[in-house]
Amino acid sequence: MIGLDTNVLVRFLVQDDPDQAAAAAALVTDLTEAEPGFVCREALVELVWVLERAYGLSRADISQAIDGLLEARELVVEIADRVAVAVDRYRKGGPGFADQMIALAGLGAGCRAT
């Protein structure tokens, strides 16, 4: 297993720089269920921020991208169940993705409120 950082995820999803997109695609397409890529929660939070701020993507488009990462059998997404809930709430509006993740972390830790 190898870890995928935010830059690889952005380049793979956005395809805005041909050379970097090709390098990211080569890395991602070599992943398998037996040798998956790991996506940590911090990379996902940063990915959403970059897609919103730098690329101006909509919540719907970003949510669809995160759904694709969650569904990919050649990826292991850290706390995927929590990410799925956070992205569903994010898609519907209200607080941003990072805030959704923070609220769910609090719930998971037994906090009464966050």
Regions found by a protein language model. Name each.
Residues 1-39, 54-61:
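Short, well-structured N-terminal submotif of metal-dependent ribonuclease cores
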Residues 46, 66-68, 83-88:
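Short linear capping/connector segments at secondary-structure termini
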Residues 5, 46, 99:
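Acidic active-site catalytic centers that drive phospho-/nucleotidyl reactions
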Residues 30-31, 69, 89, 109:
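Hydrophobic helix-cap positions at the C-terminus of alpha-helices
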